[in-house]
Each structure stands twice: as structure tokens, then as C-alpha cells.
Amino acid sequence: MQASATVRNALLDAIETAIGVSPTLKIFDGAMPANVGVADAGTVLATMTLPSDWMAAASAAAKAKSGTWQDAGADASGLARYYRLYAGATCHLQGLCGQNWAGSTAYSLNQHVVNGNNVYKCTTAGTSASSGGPTGTGTGITDGTCVWDYVGPKEMVLDNGNIAAGQQITVNTYQWNAGNA
């Protein structure tokens, strides 16, 4: 099925309406559960109540976060690997998260980074190259002394994916896209 931009915008806006105002966002370490109906996995690193109007109106079949998404003090230390979005106790959305890749930076085993439109997991800790970063959708991607595996498409970008308890955490970017034009 293919849909016009108007229909795709309406679909994206309906997701925000269905979840409701001021949902709770939780950032976790560990492996992402198989689906939103499965119990949380890993440690909750950060918890934040989002603004009442937490997503901007959809436009051109894309819908981006609205307002500031921030936790003034992280709940625990760990590596941000996935997020879950709740209305009350019900998880409605989950997906990958990480920080933007940076050159000549030390990365830890299992740390997630975002490069281009992809999320990568560090499988060999080390220091990234001075430029470029991981690319492609394979495994064993060499970048300086780091080795990366492709995990999935970019969803949520944090200011820092290696979180310390008490640290302020900010979601820099979050966007939904509706394909099938």
C-alpha cells in the first residue's frame, strides 16, 4: 500500500494522540525486549516525563520531538542501548538509542553510537578513527581500534550514551518517519 503525505502525516499524528500527553520515557542498558508487550529488560538508566505536547505536528511524512526531553539526574550508571515510552504502566513504543559517533574517542564494549542513519554496537572496545566512523549494515566494522556491528536504524540520539548515576541526560533528536510514498 502506498499513501499520500497527508495520510502518512495523519498516521504519525495519531500515534501521539493514542499515547496521550506527558508520557514517560525510560532509557535502559541491556538487550531490547522482543516487543512492547514483554517486561522491561536491563537497568533503567534515566526516567523523564515528556512535555504535554511531546511531538511536533507531522510534516512531509516525518514527526520530530517537541520541547526539551531531559532527566536532571540519571537513575543509574550504564550504557544506553534502548528506550521505552509509556502511558501509565503501558509500554507503547520501544527502540534503539545511542550517542552520535565522534572521532578519536574511546568507546566501551556494547556502547551504542549513531553514525549517519544507523545505530552500531561496539564489539571490541577501543578508540575510534579521527574521521569517518562505522558505516554499512554488517558486522566486524573496523574504526580505529574499535570494532562495530550494525544494530538497526537511527531512532533516538542522546547527548551521552555512557551514563553515570546522577548525570543530566538529554535527548538530542527523536523522529518518526512514515514511508510508502
Identify the residue ranges that each predicted region occupies.
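Tryptophan-rich substrate-binding surfaces of secreted polymer-degrading and adhesive proteins
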Residues: 98-152
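Small cysteine-rich, disulfide-bonded extracellular modules of the LU/uPAR three-finger superfamily
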Residues: 1-83, 87-98, 151-181
